[in-house]
UniProtKB/Swiss-Prot annotation:
One of its GO terms (molecular function) is mRNA 5'-UTR binding. NCBIfam families: csrA, PRK01712.1. Belongs to the CsrA/RsmA family. The gene is csrA. This is Translational regulator CsrA. Coiled coil: none annotated. It comes from Pectobacterium carotovorum subsp. carotovorum (strain PC1). It holds the Pfam family CsrA. The keyword Lyase does not apply.
Amino acid sequence: MLILTRRVGETLMIGDEVTVTVLGVKGNQVRIGVNAPKEVSVHREEIYQRIQAEKSQPTSY
């Protein structure tokens, strides 16, 4: 795992097309903004896990 330190307003790049910007810090919460192409899915981890669980469930008709 790569660990980076960023201040509010600073950005990191993932590849050529994805940026992650620190928008604010309040207590133990960090607000981030993600800019990515439409074909790149961006989800919070708990939402991603729910999507994956739904995909693995058999479809009943």
